[in-house]
Amino acid sequence: MLERAIDSIGHRAHLLPEFRLNGVRTSADNVIGTLGGGKGLVEACFTGTAPIVGMFAVGLMRAAFDAALTFARTERRGGAVPIIEYQAIGYALADAKTAIEAVRTLSWRAAQAVDVQTPSALELALHAKVFGSETAVRIITDLMRVVGVDSYDHDMPLGDLLADALVLPLFDGGNMGVRRRQLHDLMRAPGYDPLAAAG
């Protein structure tokens, strides 16, 4: 039964329905996986989708970077030169681009590890999701500071990009839960090798 559909502030193309199932029964032939194995099945699905969240983050940051770079190259804000000529703006843009490339590389590595099923695939995928999603929120906010109050205007894409980025740490397994249940469990395991994900 559909309980409600969340009317999200961002990521508008993604439907967020809440369902409640009561008294649902099925035959053993229709069970996906094994009885009692649902948690593992769901976690395996998240392994494949976690790098995609990192890639979402890259796309959002890249769009925000392009908007901020264009603004910095064309706006003088009452000065004699475009604001990109000021060190503070250059540093902010350089830091943003560094973060974008770091998330891009981690997400690619994670996706490749999932694709070829390396032993470190789960850890890399989870790091891509957590690091990518949280970095996107921070970087888009930093790029909004480059633009200033104009970034809050509907004519600029930055506000919408931030609204989309804000959901990334929350969906597909919230980052706090990913840290607590998955990454923490990996690191607590007796055979955990912290260098395995390094390749």
Report the location of each language-model feature.
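Glycine-rich phosphate/cofactor-binding loops in nucleotide/flavin-utilizing enzymes
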Residues: 147-199
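Oxyanion-binding "anion nests"
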Residues: 54-85, 93-97
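Alpha-helical transition-metal enzyme core signature, strongest for iron centers
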Residues: 58, 62-65, 93-103, 107, ...
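Conserved catalytic-core motifs characterized by acidic clusters
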Residues: 5-8, 29-46, 70-86, 149, ...
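C-terminal helix-coil-helix/basic helical segment that borders enzyme active sites and/or dimer interfaces
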Residues: 72-77, 97-131, 142-152
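Short alpha-helical scaffolding segments that buttress acidic/His motifs in well-ordered protein cores
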Residues: 42, 110, 162-166
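FAD-binding core of flavoproteins
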Residues: 1-58, 62, 190-199
